[in-house]
């Protein structure tokens, strides 16, 4: 939509099974258009580049907030993602500074408690 921040999201629908997947690898802000794309999807794979907006500052000393690089932090998108009815919800493209990469981190525990997974290399998704 005109005037909204950049959001890249692709919706795939399997005509044979009726299954659908939304892959949103670049989410600068949660928009009404993104909400509409996710509605009714069976699986959602969302931008999980950073968990916290100030992650780069703490990890590298560089003051580069996640939002200024076009990535809505997981801490700010998790509740919105949780509100959708998809059977599977995953974050992908996690930066090496993202604490949710560690399976024993509080951030990963928060996601898992919300029914949200972290995608991994070799993951196969059925629609």
Where does each model-flagged region fall?
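Cap/insert and terminal regions of metallo-dependent hydrolase folds
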Residues: 5, 18-20, 28-122
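Beta-strand-turn-beta hairpins that frame and shape the catalytic cleft
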Residues: 14-21, 127
């Amino acid at each position: 939509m005109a005037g909204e921040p950049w959001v890249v999201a692709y919706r795939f629908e399997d005509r044979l099974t009726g299954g659908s997947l939304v892959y949103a690898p670049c989410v600068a802000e949660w928009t009404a258009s993104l909400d509409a794309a996710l509605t009714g999807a069976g699986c959602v794979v969302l931008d999980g580049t950073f968990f916290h907006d100030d992650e780069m500052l703490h990890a590298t000393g560089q003051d580069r907030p996640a939002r200024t690089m076009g990535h809505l932090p997981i801490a700010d998108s998790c509740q919105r993602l949780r509100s959708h009815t998809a059977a599977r919800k995953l974050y992908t493209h996690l930066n090496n500074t993202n604490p949710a990469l560690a399976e024993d981190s509080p951030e990963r525990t928060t996601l898992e408690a919300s029914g949200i997974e972290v995608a991994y290399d070799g993951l196969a998704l059925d629609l």
